[in-house]
């Protein structure tokens, strides 16, 4: 099939819950990609977590064969992309492999902040955009108002928007005709030499690493010797094919097509996403521009509740890493929690997804330490450090200055919830940069410290706006800040797993809250237990768990007072000895509850 004019490569852009995976299901159904009995909801969301949470995490691809009204048969390559801010990187990869996009907007809710970010990315990639207004069958649907909103915010023409209901299947044929007539075919191949973009890779236990590619020039066929231009690795192609969404093996992938190949590659880490794949014998001269590397911004420790599970955790993380190159980890040990791993994530949702996959797919019971971000430390001796583990923070006396990362956040919220959202941003040390109105929705741009966002910002934003606010952010700058290390001591012993780096203005409040929480969680012992929060050597908050007291006088019926005094003195001496040598066991449940994300 070398008719590039009959190929359409497109991605679907939409905010969470605006219906993109449902639309993808209807397109697959309409084009006969699966029989009716094989259809399930959200066909392209392959992970159970994706289906349950109703979100797309990994970008998926499918080739559809469509007989258009003009009598020609078209080959449509659909990339279903994630909508959540943590997975924006998956979106950028999908967009780079396509020429056009379907912008799906919920006609009952209008434009959301994350949609904006993805649309601007699509425009940067020179995409032709087809507007699709979904959920037309709902009583709250306001297509004309939403069209006006899109013209005001994004500035694209909405006169030929396609109105559909993906759930009931209304207007699906109109979407397919719009894809064929409005989206451009791939550019003509300028050379016969293979040049392909590595879009994604994942691990298959039978085939090894499966690589998703978009062929730009030339062709990719079985038994070909190929070279990865970033790593200079050479492999022999074993299988070539595409998804419909079932796996189909074919002989060759031509220019303009999206498909997969396998080549006995052992690790996903060997395949750099955005790399250029070329023929080993006749390599292309210039590599494709690729993507900017995806760096983790949120870090936390993962520890097994049972230390014998450590090897199992190590193997499980290695397997997850095979499918998720954006996830990083390294070994670390804690005096309170034993040996575990320090892990880096793209954001809090990414952290939750990894945690959930570890417990579900690998049956692991884990303790997660408080999330932290990367701080830049300037030492007095001129040395510069980057730290994401509070335990690694040097002595404050030796530090010249500390910088924390700030983000630029775009929040879109209905007018009636604006006050609550503004006060939340102010409480989180935010600085307002811009404030505008589009119809009855406010669009505010804030500069916020990432440290404040990783705790509970997203949950609180959703609750104070009854779920209507949408939030999108990107890293902005590092700025000097008055940061301190908040330590927690139990019976004068530092519990390193509970240490956090906080802004000085929030230290006392955070310390007091942690002490109160631990007081409720640690069971009473036979001695008083002091729980303290400290900054350096200064104690800023304290709670005391009162001792349990055994009634040593229960068997003394009357009799001499000196007998009672002797028993009480003996008890007192025993408690003194316990205070001196006794270790306070903090139960795992107390750790888990104390480290719950959320700053009460």
From Swiss-Prot:
Query: Which BP terms in the Gene Ontology apply to this protein?
Result: positive regulation of translation
**HAMAP family associated with the record:** LepA
Protein family membership:
Belongs to the TRAFAC class translation factor GTPase superfamily. Classic translation factor GTPase family. LepA subfamily.
Write out the residues that bind GTP: 17-22, 134-137
Q: From which source organism is this entry? A: Rickettsia africae (strain ESF-5)
| Reactions accelerated catalytically | GTP + H2O = GDP + phosphate + H(+)
Q: What is its main location?
A: membrane
What function is annotated for this protein?
Required for accurate and efficient protein synthesis under certain stress conditions. May act as a fidelity factor of the translation reaction, by catalyzing a one-codon backward translocation of tRNAs on improperly translocated ribosomes. Back-translocation proceeds from a post-translocation (POST) complex to a pre-translocation (PRE) complex, thus giving elongation factor G a second chance to translocate the tRNAs correctly. Binds to ribosomes in a GTP-dependent manner.
Q: Which gene encodes it?
A: lepA
Quote a single Gene Ontology cellular component term.
plasma membrane
Q: Which InterPro entries match?
A: EF-4 (IPR006297), EFG_III/V (IPR035647), EFG_V-like (IPR000640), EFTu-like_2 (IPR004161), G_TR_CS (IPR031157), LepA_C_sf (IPR038363), LepA_CTD (IPR013842), LepA_IV (IPR035654)
Output one GO MF annotation: GTP binding
Q: Where does this one sit in the cell?
A: Cell inner membrane
**Record's PROSITE patterns?**
G_TR_1 (PS00301), G_TR_2 (PS51722)
Membrane topology designation: Peripheral membrane protein
Where in this chain does the record put each tr-type G domain?
5-187
Query: Which keywords belong to this entry?
Result: Cell inner membrane, Cell membrane, GTP-binding, Hydrolase, Membrane, Nucleotide-binding, Protein biosynthesis
Q: Which NCBIfam families match?
A: lepA, small_GTP
Q: Can you say what this protein is called?
A: Elongation factor 4
